[in-house]
Each structure stands twice: as C-alpha cells, then as structure tokens.
From Swiss-Prot:
Protein family: Belongs to the TRAFAC class TrmE-Era-EngA-EngB-Septin-like GTPase superfamily. EngB GTPase family.
The encoding gene: engB
Keyword Hydrolase annotated: no
Record's function text: Necessary for normal cell division and for the maintenance of normal septation.
Keywords for this protein: Cell cycle, Cell division, GTP-binding, Magnesium, Metal-binding, Nucleotide-binding, Septation
PROSITE patterns per UniProt: G_ENGB
Organism: Clostridium kluyveri (strain ATCC 8527 / DSM 555 / NBRC 12016 / NCIMB 10680 / K1)
Name of the protein in question: Probable GTP-binding protein EngB
Record flagged with keyword Nuclease: no
Amino acid sequence: MEIKQAEFIISAVHPSQYPKDKRIEIAFVGRSNVGKSSLINALTNRKKLVKVSGTPGKTRLINFFLINNEFYFVDLPGYGYAKISKTEKKSWGKVVEDYLRGREELKRVILLLDCRHKPTNDDITMYKWLKYYNYNTIIVATKVDKVSKSQLFKNLKIIKDTLKPETGDEILTFSSLNKQGKEEFLKVLESVIDFYS
C-alpha cells in the first residue's frame, strides 16, 4: 500500500466530534515520547502532518487523519507521563475510554512500545484494556535504530514474555529515522483495510 494522501480532519475530546462517515479507523496508542507522531509522519511521508510535541503528556486530544480518502489514522493521547496531575490522568482516561468503548469503525489498534525498554505497567494495562474491548492489536516496537540486532532480538522476547500477545496479535518493528519496517507495516495495514472494505 502506498499512502498518497493524508489530511488532518479534526481534534476531538467528545464522541459527538468524531467523524460520522463510517470509514475504517486504525488507532495509534502508546506512552508519551514513544515516537507515535514520528511514526505516523514516516508512514504518510509527511514531516509535519502530526506535530511532534517536545512536552511529553501534552496532547489531550484524539486526532483524526484521513488517509488516501479511504480510511482514518487516529492518534490517541500518549499515556504514562509522571508529571501530570491525577485530574489530568483521569481526563485522559475518559477521553480514550470514550473512544475505545464500542467504536464500530475502529478495526485495529497499534500499540507502540519503545524497543529499548521493558513494557511498563501502563503498557501492560493498555494491552489488557484493548483485549477487554476485543480489539485486534498490532504491537509495534519503535526506535529500533537505537539498538543492535542482538539486543533487539532479546528485547522483543522480553516484550512477548511480558505482554503475552494473544493469537493473531502481531509484533512488528519500526524506525521512523531510517524507515526500517515501514514496508512490512504498510502491508499489514493494507490487509486490514482490504479485509474490512
């Protein structure tokens, strides 16, 4: 699949603001600073489609991007940033849960993990949450250019052993810097789009 067109549509905090055109949605979620914005920019070949925030935990909105005039990438707010208040954490939880709960258009969730670190409790909770809502999930280990191949192999095993992915949930690797893993990722996304189209 080639992404030829990518357009920001809306930032939403409430379900009433979500697009109503019934197009397929693929959501991206992960810890603050896991490289979510950079990954979406790399997939779409657009350097500034998604603003890369210098302040972790700043994004509190759900951003919808129309891809190839056919489906949406949905950028969910990052989680796990220690310096936000309990009230902010609660509001983050509500925004994300409102979206995940019964969103028919959502056909796949991409859970991003920094390949250099063991999944955190927040990552484990998020994966369990996605399974609770019965979403098929693609786990993507980001920043793979920052580790050696042997270290990556070890770290992927740690990710598998920690999250214990359900059958059908794939683990992919990705580098926004050198685009490693991009073709494979796009192929997987294409199969999702084809399946539901």
